Structures are given as C-alpha cells and as structure tokens.
C-alpha cells in the first residue's frame, strides 16, 4: 500500500465564513527550532536548518521527479547521517521531533527553555511542569483539545442574540471549566474554544459564538479576578495560598518541626519544601524503592532489567541511564566541573567533592585499628583494611595476578588489551591511566603545582620534587 507523505507546511489554512464572521484555524505544525543530541554523541543530530531544508523542499523547485527524489534523499542523509548513527538513534530523533510537534505551543516554549537532550529529559521536564501546575490548581485531564481561532471580521448582533452573548460573557466559571477563553492579542480578538468550536454555558451547547462590536462586556469579563483557594489558620486570622505554608505556620504554634531533616534549618528550605509536598507514590516491585515521578521509576527499573541503551562512542561502554553516560564522558574529556571552594581542587563527580570536603569540615575520621591511618569515609577504610587481611579476591584471567579492589583489576586489564581510554584534547595522545593524562596536560598548560619549600623551584610531578630535594637539600631533609 502506497503511503502519501504530505508536508504540514503545505496544508492550506481552514477558512470558515458565516454572516460576516471568518474563522481561521492556526497551523499547529510549527517547526521545532531547537536541535536535539543523540545519546553518546556530542554533535547535534537534529540540526534545525538541515531538517528545515528537508521538510520544506517543493516539487516545483526541481526539474522533475528523479531530481526531486534524489534531492530529498540527499537532504535526508545530511540530516539523519545514517552512516554514523544507529537505527535506534535515528528513530529516537524522529519520535522526539514528532512528539514536540504535537505538543501545545506554550509547552513547546517551556520545554525548549530546558534544552533537553533525550526522550527521558523531555518527559521529566513535562512532568515537572505538571507538578508545578498541580500546586496552584489541578487541571482536568479530560479537558477537550483546544484550537485557536482568529476572529478577523465582526458583524453586529441584534435582539436576542446580543443579549445571549452578553449573558455568556458575564458567566466566568462554567466557561473556564469547559475550555473557553477570550482575550485580546496585538489588537485582535482571540477566542479559544473546544475542538468543535462551540461555547458551552450552564450545561447547554450553543451555536458557534459570533463576536459583536461592543467590547465593554469582554473587558468586564476579563477584569474579574481569578478565584484562589486560601488556607486559613485556626489560631489566627492569617491566610495562605499553599497548603504546605499553612502546615509550616502551624508548627510555630505547636513547636514541632516541619520534619526532622537538617535541611529545614538551612538556606535550601525552599527546594526541600517541594520535596516534602510531593509523595513518593511510584514504587519498584523488585527492590521496594519509591519515587516521586513515574519517569524516575522507569529509569530505575532499567537497572533490574539489565537494559543499557546509552553507549559511549569513544570506548563502547554502555550505561542504563543517560546521566551515567554523561558522567563517564568526563573521563575522556578530562572535565572536572565540581570545584572545592576551600582549596580550589576540581572533581569529576559530586560525590568525590563531598568526600573531599570532609577534610575541610573537620569531621571525625575513620581510623584503621591495625595501623592507625585515618580516612574521611568508611568505604575507603574498608578498602584499606583489605591490605591487612591480604584478601585479593579479584583475579586476572590472563596472567593470574590477584587484586583486592575491582578498580585495580580493571586498570590491570588495560595492560593486556592495550586500551588507552584517556585522550588528550590538545594533541590526541592517549593514556592508560587518568593520572598519566593529568600529568601530560600540565605540559600544555605549563602548570607546575609541586614547589620546593626551601628554594621555591616548581615541578610538574611530585617525583621530580622528591628527586630535587634529595639532591639539593639532602642535609636539611636529614
């Protein structure tokens, strides 16, 4: 069966004329301006100019059918790049583009502000918007799909029709619930109705609404304030818009804390209150962990299913979540976005920064009972204690060498495989260990962080400083 592909931009606007009133339905299929990135690739696949050229090519611009098909194929290849991207990546882009097209325009703008990079990011942004809207008032999920109609020519109404329109303009709440809205934009009257173009009032369906030249009723209707739900304190006459604000206020009378978390006493109270106001209603049946959003539960369940759709283009490693891939890519790029405000040291992960900051916060360290060595984290102490227990449960299948840590075994495997995943962005030289890359980058940056306390001479590596001190300051060190 042949399928006819019709560009949305070629559809003529729908014109309806009745007694001097012309209604034009706005074209919903607007071009999505923000390009999207495929997982594991830093180059944007959905480049808007290429997509736009492909969508807007006209048959009249070519000499015939053969050239038209050839041109379409060429533009499609330039846009989707099938020689460098998988079928799943191309499918992801097309699904994303169509999904963003069918979104209401106001949601398109809100999503575009967050620059999402995947389908999961779009879902999370939209669910966050739904939760934010839910705090001010629940929306009716069965509300009919709206379409915007532009009233360009208006004829005066007479007699009973004029009174009926005036009566409907004064009724605010029923029309709002049924999906009708009237406003003025750029000097033109805009009427938003349900999908059939009819205005519902007092439970009755009337004929398509015709505008009149008396704007006073419309202005009086728009001037009515929107009803707000207020929460009143039983002890005092104070009123609150948010229910959580009332609960927090009530704690001042009872003396009971809003929650036992220390965050309630910190500067991040606003964000923490949002967490308290949202129940974790989505629970994983495998491990019992609960989540606030269904998208977070779906993302978590990939761990149990073993699904790993996100692959690194540099080394081929796969991940179950996009966040894991982005964090892994920092190994190849050398990016360390988390900065310690106390000493200026940078870290690749936020958990590494938190662990490091315990040194500055003077928290009680974890001490090894065997040798007295202290650690800022209990996990590091556990790893250290394997030295004393001589437990080396991780064995190399190639040479039989055993290691106490999995990370040591992974690093050792690179000797057999010849893998060098850490590449310099400046000269493209690759290294087996991240520490070797860090030392190499100092050559390009002319960085010498190790300084002699005696003479002030600086070195790129700690070993160079030790050699210098042994040779020039041997007497003072002794």
Swiss-Prot record:
A cellular component annotation (GO) from this entry: nucleus
Zinc finger (C2H2-type): 231-253, 282-304, 310-332, 338-360, 366-388, 394-416, 422-444, 450-472
Record carries keyword Repeat: yes
InterPro entries attached to this UniProt entry: SCAN_dom, SCAN_sf, Znf_C2H2_sf, Znf_C2H2_type
Record keywords: Isopeptide bond, Metal-binding, Nucleus, Repeat, Transcription, Transcription regulation, Ubl conjugation, Zinc, Zinc-finger
Gene Ontology terms describing biological process: regulation of DNA-templated transcription; regulation of transcription by RNA polymerase II
Superkingdom assignment: Eukaryota
Chain positions covered by the region annotation Disordered: 159-181, 200-226
Subcellular localization: Nucleus
Cross-link position per record: Glycyl lysine isopeptide (Lys-Gly) (interchain with G-Cter in SUMO2): 17
Induction description: By serum stimulation.
Basic and acidic residues biased stretches: 164-181, 207-226
Domain SCAN box residues, every copy: 51-133
Gene Ontology MF term list: DNA-binding transcription factor activity; DNA-binding transcription factor activity, RNA polymerase II-specific; RNA polymerase II cis-regulatory region sequence-specific DNA binding; zinc ion binding
PANTHER family registered for this protein in UniProt: ZINC FINGER AND SCAN DOMAIN-CONTAINING, ZINC FINGER AND SCAN DOMAIN-CONTAINING PROTEIN 23
Annotated function: May be involved in transcriptional regulation.
Stated name of the protein: Zinc finger and SCAN domain-containing protein 26
Source organism of the structure: Homo sapiens
Gene from which this protein is expressed: ZSCAN26
